[in-house]
Structures are given as structure tokens and as C-alpha cells.
Amino acid sequence: MSNVDHAEIAKFEALAHRWWDRESEFKPLHDINPLRVNWIDERAGLAGKTVLDVGCGGGILSEAMAQRGASVTGIDMGEAPLAVARLHQLESGVAVDYRQITAEQMAEEMPGQFDVVTCLEMLEHVPDPASVIRACHRLVKPGGQVFLSTINRNPKAYLFAVIGAEYILQLLPRGTHDFRKFIRPSELGAWSRDAGLEVKDIIGLTYNPLTKHYKLANDVDVNYMVQTQREA
């Protein structure tokens, strides 16, 4: 059985045409992208590396990593987001290889082929996130790094990521997130270790509604990113 939630795919298919509109529902992704790319680049040194972006959507992160000198492959199961990613690539001239395939299928085809694997803002949208993490471990080279991000599961995360972001501030469309699918850092850490990945670092992403700015912080109560590494 494929590790795909078709309702989640349909949700992003409907919004895909606005993926690169910086004032659309995807504004938060555009706003946090420089912070995420810098954090990854500082730890992985993207230039000259082979990178797989799992759950690439319309290619915001994929293109940014390619601009840093990485050879990037982006995979997603959404047909419309991938079409948008390919169209934007023609406009930007940034080379990314986009494929419609799951991480698990990709791991069967290309095990141990990538220096770096990223899987950001995707794990909370699949039925079995631990399966995706196991696939990421299989895809990365020995000694390679896997970067993951998701949303913590606690009352504060519900207040900020669902009530605040979707209903009060209207940063995201209502129904973007299902609180039950949010993932605690302890759970993400356990799944990573079970897959054979060592957790190296964790950082939070916080939003100030007054300044409308995001920043990296030690507060992992809501959005957070994790750096992991496969044994050499």
C-alpha cells in the first residue's frame, strides 16, 4: 500500500497554481525558505552535493538549494505542484530534476545515491511518517545528512499553527493542518534513530505577528527542523 494521503494531495493540487505567488497561501513558505536553506547549507555545504528534496511541492526549496550549487532532484506525488515546479524552472533557469514518485519507491530505485536528503513540511501530511524517514535513510549515502522539519504536537502548537495561522492571522487556508498528525520532537527522534539516523541538531522556527517576521530560535514548541546523519 502506497504511503500517500490522497486528500492531502488534492488539497495542495487545488492551490498549486499560486505556489510561487509570494502574497498567496504560500507566503509563509517563501518567508521561511531563506532561513531553512541557510541552516541546511551551513551544516551540509550544498555546493557540489547531490541533494534529494522529498515532498518538494512547487519547488521553492529545491530551486534555492540548486542556486547554492547543489545538483537537486525533487520528488512529490502531486501532479499539479510538479507541473508548477517545472514551469517555474523554465522561468528561473534553475536546473532541478523533478519526478512524481514516493520516497519509498525512490529508495528502491536509488539507494545510497544522495549526499543530502531534505524532507521539510511533509511528514505531517502522510499516513506513515516513520516509513518516509526510513526511506530517507536508505536514500542518503553513508555519512550523508538528512534534514527533517514538521510541527510539534502540543496545545501551543495547536493555538499557533492551527487557530492562529489558519483562523486568526489567516496565513494559511483553513484545513491546511490536522493537529493529530503533528509530531513531537521525541517521536521524530525515535523514528530517526530506529531508521539508523543520528540526531545531530534541532532548531525552532518562530513567528512574530507584530513584525510579521520569522526567525530561527531554540523554541521548538511549534515549527522545528532536525539535522540527522547516517553512519559512515
Swiss-Prot record:
Its EC number is 2.1.1.222, 2.1.1.64. It holds the Pfam family Methyltransf_23. GO terms for biological process: methylation. It comes from the Bacteria. Pathway: Cofactor biosynthesis; ubiquinone biosynthesis. CDD domains: AdoMet_MTases. Keywords: Methyltransferase, S-adenosyl-L-methionine, Transferase, Ubiquinone biosynthesis. S-adenosyl-L-methionine binds at R36, G55, D76, L120. It catalyses: a 3-demethylubiquinol + S-adenosyl-L-methionine = a ubiquinol + S-adenosyl-L-homocysteine + H(+); a 3-(all-trans-polyprenyl)benzene-1,2-diol + S-adenosyl-L-methionine = a 2-methoxy-6-(all-trans-polyprenyl)phenol + S-adenosyl-L-homocysteine + H(+). SUPFAM superfamilies: S-adenosyl-L-methionine-dependent methyltransferases. InterPro entries: SAM-dependent_MTases_sf, UbiG_MeTrfase. GO terms for molecular function: 2-polyprenyl-6-hydroxyphenol methylase activity; 3-demethylubiquinol 3-O-methyltransferase activity; polyprenyldihydroxybenzoate methyltransferase activity. Belongs to the methyltransferase superfamily. UbiG/COQ3 family. NCBIfam families: UbiG. O-methyltransferase that catalyzes the 2 O-methylation steps in the ubiquinone biosynthetic pathway. HAMAP family: UbiG. This is Ubiquinone biosynthesis O-methyltransferase.
